[in-house]
């Protein structure tokens, strides 16, 4: 009697199947080999029956199609979290994409000086507009704020002391820890104060001839309340000037215009204090592309540009184009091109109107329009919530978790509160309401 494993089709026979005539032979070979190996392993482990040849061919074809499908897909963000890190943070307006499309579909002057006819500098493209908006001496853009932190520490505090409050030794998403970053950058961490209280004298008493930098980190994803004390940026700047040190503020998020649900200072206000160096993210409340934007003293940023690490951390043409377009929209107060800010400023009346439109198009659910709370997200504005409007849904047969899973499978990311699935209107675009209603009716 023939061994069951002998019934498995050979790789070359699979490749010769007419259904695979237009398929990539390299990819098909890899997928078929992997699947056949799985079948062998399962059979040898617990004698799992060998599937018929046709079933094997169908599964190989399914895997082939799945492997070619984009892994990044558009979603409906119904969570109410505006800058949702897991969902790609800030969204670009279609008008902005159209604006930068010619730069991405043709050659451009990324590193070419059109006036001089020779090699230029890619960082010059954001130089003028950022200086105009912030009123600072100089700017530099790297590929994210973590890169900015590392570059600054590596340039100015390698084998020297970077003094920081114990209450600001944060960890953010992905296990990004400030102490580890400082260590990897070659800086000597010198923590001062306590978790809840740090005074100016704590910094001053810690300063030695080996000190290079006074660092302040924005507590982006948590807050300390109650019996607390911290040294503000103005004091840190004064102290650094007194002792001829560099003050550096890792702002994390940062925003140019006033956001309705926070009393934190804007980037313009921070820049007006003339700090040595500040860094923040381009894709959080600024509403642009992922980038780490550094501004401050020209002499210091010139030194950053000479660090060989900058070559590894530099931004590409898409980032520069998207950031420039976003900053231009800020400069012209054209917030239609900055969805992040537009969402933040939506009134409850506008949100309720969206909820009513969606509710009228959905059938069979027990639904209710209610006021809820949302957050900025992206590690910005910790513990600062704002009012929003949501459509709360209950399904007659499915549990809230089952309904949430069904929606998620169709690209709708919602949240569950009090045994109901909530669709927060603040982060759902009006252009998505029709398709969202269709999905909800299909799920029902």
Curated annotation (Swiss-Prot):
Modified residue annotations for N6-(pyridoxal phosphate)lysine: 284
Top-level class of the enzyme under EC nomenclature: transferase
Keywords of the record: Cytoplasm, Protein biosynthesis, Pyridoxal phosphate, Selenium, Transferase
Gene Ontology MF annotations: L-seryl-tRNA(Sec) selenium transferase activity
Cellular compartment(s): Cytoplasm
Transmembrane region(s): none
Catalysed transformations (reactions): L-seryl-tRNA(Sec) + selenophosphate + H(+) = L-selenocysteinyl-tRNA(Sec) + phosphate
Taxonomic superkingdom: Bacteria
EC number: 2.9.1.1
GO biological process, one term: conversion of seryl-tRNAsec to selenocys-tRNAsec
GO cellular component, one term: cytoplasm
Cofactor list: pyridoxal 5'-phosphate
Keyword Transferase included in the entry's annotation: yes
Metabolic or biological pathway, per its Swiss-Prot or TrEMBL entry: Aminoacyl-tRNA biosynthesis; selenocysteinyl-tRNA(Sec) biosynthesis; selenocysteinyl-tRNA(Sec) from L-seryl-tRNA(Sec) (bacterial route): step 1/1
Homology family: Belongs to the SelA family.
NCBIfam families on file: selA
Role description: Converts seryl-tRNA(Sec) to selenocysteinyl-tRNA(Sec) required for selenoprotein biosynthesis.
Name of this protein: L-seryl-tRNA(Sec) selenium transferase
Organism: Wolinella succinogenes (strain ATCC 29543 / DSM 1740 / CCUG 13145 / JCM 31913 / LMG 7466 / NCTC 11488 / FDC 602W) (Vibrio succinogenes)
Taxonomic placement: Bacteria, Pseudomonadati, Campylobacterota, Epsilonproteobacteria, Campylobacterales
The encoding gene: selA
């Amino acid at each position: 009697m023939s061994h069951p494993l002998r019934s498995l089709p050979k790789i070359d026979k699979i490749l010769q199947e007419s259904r695979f005539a237009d398929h990539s032979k390299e990819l098909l070979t890899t997928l078929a080999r992997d699947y056949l190996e799985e079948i062998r392993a399962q059979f040898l482990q617990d004698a799992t029956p060998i599937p018929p040849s046709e079933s094997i061919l169908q599964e190989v074809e399914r895997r082939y199609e799945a492997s070619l499908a984009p892994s990044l897909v558009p979603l409906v963000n119904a969570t109410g979290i505006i800058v949702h890190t897991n969902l790609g943070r800030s969204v670009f307006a279609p008008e902005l994409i159209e604006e930068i499309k010619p730069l991405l579909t043709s050659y451009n002057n990324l590193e070419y000086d059109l006036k001089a006819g020779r090699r230029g500098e890619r960082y010059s493209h954001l130089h003028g507009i950022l200086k105009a908006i912030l009123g600072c001496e100089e700017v530099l853009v790297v590929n994210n704020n973590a890169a900015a932190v590392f570059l600054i520490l590596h340039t100015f505090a390698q084998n020297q002391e970077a003094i920081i409050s114990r209450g600001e030794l944060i960890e953010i998403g992905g296990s990004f820890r400030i102490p580890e970053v400082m260590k990897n950058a070659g800086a000597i961490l010198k923590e001062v104060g306590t978790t809840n209280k740090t005074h100016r004298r704590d910094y001053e008493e810690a300063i030695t001839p080996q000190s290079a930098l006074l660092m302040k980190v924005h507590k982006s994803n948590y807050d300390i309340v109650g019996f607390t004390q911290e040294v503000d940026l103005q004091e840190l700047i004064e102290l650094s000037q007194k002792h001829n040190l560099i003050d550096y503020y890792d702002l994390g998020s940062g925003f140019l215009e006033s956001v309705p649900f926070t009393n934190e200072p804007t980037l313009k206000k921070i820049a007006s204090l003339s700090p040595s160096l500040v860094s923040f993210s381009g894709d959080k409340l600024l509403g642009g592309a992922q980038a780490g934007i550094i501004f401050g003293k020209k002499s210091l940023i010139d030194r950053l540009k000479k660090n060989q690490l900058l070559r590894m951390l530099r931004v590409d043409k898409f980032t520069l184009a998207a950031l420039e377009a976003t900053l231009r929209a800020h400069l012209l107060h054209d917030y239609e091109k900055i969805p992040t800010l537009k969402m933040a400023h939506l009134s409850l009346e506008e949100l309720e109107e969206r909820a009513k439109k969606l509710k009228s198009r959905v059938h069979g659910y027990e639904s209710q329009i209610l006021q809820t709370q949302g957050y900025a997200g992206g590690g910005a504005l910790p513990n600062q919530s704002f009012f929003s409007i949501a459509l709360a849904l209950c399904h007659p047969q499915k549990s809230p978790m089952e309904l949430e899973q069904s929606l998620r499978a169709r690209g709708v990311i919602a949240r569950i509160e009090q045994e109901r699935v909530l669709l927060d209107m603040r982060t759902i675009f009006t252009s998505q309401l029709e398709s969202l209603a269709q999905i909800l009716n299909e799920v029902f």
